[in-house]
Structures are given as structure tokens and as C-alpha cells.
Amino acid sequence: MRARVVIVAAVLAATAITGCQRPPAPGPQAGSLTGAPILNTVTAQAVVRDMGAAGLPVANPRDVAKQKCPDIKCIEAIETDTVTVLVFSTTGAAEGYAGATPGTFQAMNIVLQFGPTVTLADKTAYEQVVNKALL
């Protein structure tokens, strides 16, 4: 009987304590995410522009996001005659794509896909442009 009284008292105390708490305020709470965190503000277009400014070949840039992104889950895609710049919403998504696609370079959420004629020296130069943009 005494154990039953102790249990009932504990349940009542717990109910009283939790009942005295304020309900959460409406809207987003501190520490909660309302969407994917923004990794950086670097766009595919800005990367292509920086590549051109560095003297690298980026002829015929065209937005191919509508064609490529639904299948590979990117958020931006600019293709040139030599390199394609893909931007993903997360680093994990970029890593997944780059890991499954030979001949790519990945830094954070950006992936470069090189054309067959791009030399090793030019690949390194393209990669340096991306790394600089992400600083």
C-alpha cells in the first residue's frame, strides 16, 4: 500500500511540474532548422566568370540546370565547352555525385566535371579557382 502511495505521489508531482511549463512560442525555435543550411553564396555563374577572369577556357557558357539537376539533384549547373560547374545544396550531395562520377573535382558543395580535352595542368587551374572562390 505504501509503495502505491509513493507512485501516485510521484505521478502527481511529475504532472504538476510539466503542467507548469509554458507552451513553445509559435514560429521557428532557436536551434531549429527551417531548411538546408547555406554553405556559401558561391554560384555556378560566379565560378565560370572567375575561371574566365583567370584566363581559363570557358567558351559558350549555358545554363543546363533544367536538363541536369532533376536527375542528379543539383541546384545549379553551368556547362561550357571545357568544364561543367555543378552546385549542390549540401556537401554530402556533391560528394555522392563526385564519388560516382569519374573525372570530377569536388570542393564543399561544388563539383567540376571536365571535358575530355582538358589537360591535367588546366584541371589544376580550374580547381584552384573553385578553392579560391570558397575562401
Language model features: what each stretch is:
Residues 1-11:
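N-terminal export and membrane-targeting signals
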Residues 6-7, 16-29:
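Bacterial lipoprotein signal-peptidase II cleavage site
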Residues 12-13, 81:
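Residue-level detector of alpha-helix boundary/anchor positions
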Residues 20-23, 34, 54, 58:
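Compositionally biased, intrinsically disordered/low-complexity regions enriched for serine, proline
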Residues 26-45, 49, 132-135:
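Low-complexity, Pro/Thr/Ser/Glu-rich flexible segments characteristic
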Residues 38-102:
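Short, solvent-exposed recognition patches
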Residues 81-135:
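Extracytosolic low-complexity repeat regions of secreted or lipid-anchored proteins
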